[in-house]
């Protein structure tokens, strides 16, 4: 009889613990990570002479797809290796979430391109309903541009077989 009661008690405890896990699963917690660099050749991608940026400010903003209203906003500053991390609570399945550059710590490398073709933000998916198992979301690297390209840029572009591209 005592064994039977112990088994029922153990089964009941397991049921309660499993329900607690289901209750916690309803709230999503994500971490958005990314990197900021100085685009030393003004070509909108990293090269071997690009530099990481400590102290750069980025913002994460989510907007509802249909209404266009802002549903989430947070800022972060890059660390000594140029990386940032933004904690996010909630699920934003019906939103477009983007990381944008806000402020550069380097006045010589502080321009954000506004050309139509330029990558001005990095999109991230902040929902658990997309097949991604991890709660860490990695954003593409974003770069501030130098006011003038470095003198080594033509050589670097040639190494990449980009002969017709000119650092602007």
From Swiss-Prot:
- The answer on whether this UniProt entry bears the keyword Disulfide bond reads yes
Query: Hey, what's the signal peptide range on this chain?
Result: 1-25
- Which superkingdom? Eukaryota
The record, for InterPro entries, names:
Allergen_Ole_e_I_CS (IPR006040), Pollen_Ole_e1_allergen (IPR006041)
According to its record, what are the GO cellular component terms?
extracellular space
Q: What is this protein called?
A: Pollen allergen Che a 1
Organism per entry: Chenopodium album
Give the sugar-modified residues.
64
Q: From the record, give the cysteines joined by S-S bonds.
A: 38-109, 41-153, 62-97
UniProt entry keywords in alphabetical sequence: Allergen, Disulfide bond, Glycoprotein, Secreted, Signal
Protein localization: Secreted
Q: Which family does it belong to?
A: Belongs to the Ole e I family.
Q: Which Pfam families match?
A: Pollen_Ole_e_1
Membrane-spanning intervals of the chain: none
Keyword Transmembrane helix assigned to the entry: answer is no
């Amino acid at each position: 009889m005592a064994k039977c009661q112990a088994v029922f008690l153990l089964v009941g405890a397991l049921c309660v613990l499993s329900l607690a896990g289901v209750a916690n699963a309803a709230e999503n917690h994500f971490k958005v990570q990314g990197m900021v660099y100085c685009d030393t050749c003004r070509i909108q991608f990293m090269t071997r002479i690009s530099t990481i940026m400590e102290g750069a400010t980025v913002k994460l903003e989510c907007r509802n797809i249909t209404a266009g209203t802002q549903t989430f906003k947070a800022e972060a500053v890059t660390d000594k290796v140029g990386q940032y991390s933004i904690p996010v609570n909630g699920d934003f399945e019906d939103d477009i979430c983007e990381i944008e550059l806000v402020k550069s710590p380097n006045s010589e490398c502080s321009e954000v391109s506004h050309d139509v073709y330029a990558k001005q933000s990095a999109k991230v998916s902040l929902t658990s309903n997309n097949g991604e198992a991890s709660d860490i979301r990695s954003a593409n690297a974003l770069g501030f541009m130098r006011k003038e390209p470095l003198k080594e840029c033509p050589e670097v572009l040639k190494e990449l077989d980009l002969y017709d591209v000119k650092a602007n």
